[in-house]
């Protein structure tokens, strides 16, 4: 009797639904995030490690221009932070650099301390919903800065059909 009960419980556990796998929209979003990261991070590492705003801004502007010329402009806002959460550069064209302090933002400090990609959603004052991805820039096991990507949620829904739930389920650390 005990063996039969144990067998039935094992069978039921094996039949339990598994957590949903990544959706096509989630996979498309992940591919875009990784492409932006792979395009920007290697070029930025030295300037970010030295906390050089001018060099960081120049590299970011050149990378954005190259992506646009190649027919694949970055479809997100980009902010580069130093290891203390202070802005080194931003991809907003024509805007003067503002050394904003993001060190009080949990998403920023978590990504820097744990050296892993962290996602969150933010709401602007006008109601615009943003999906933010904080990617630590790591050199020799130490966080030297952060690559912050901000995507307009409605743009991602239009391009990929990505929902908020799918965004939150995307694993960018694997």
PLM regions and their residue ranges:
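Bacterial N-terminal signal peptides
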Residues: 2-13
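Juxtamembrane extracytoplasmic/periplasmic/luminal helical "stalk" adjacent to the first N-terminal
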Residues: 15-54, 161-174
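Extracytoplasmic/periplasmic sensory segments of membrane signal-transduction proteins
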Residues: 29-95
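Solvent-exposed, extracytoplasmic
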Residues: 52-74, 104, 150-174
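Extracytoplasmic/periplasmic sensor domains and loops in membrane signaling proteins
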Residues: 53-57, 93-123, 162-166
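Short loop/turn motifs at secondary-structure junctions and domain boundaries
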Residues: 68-73, 112-113, 124-129
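Generic short beta-strand
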Residues: 78-79, 134-135, 167
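Conserved beta-strands of PAS-like sensory domains
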Residues: 128-164
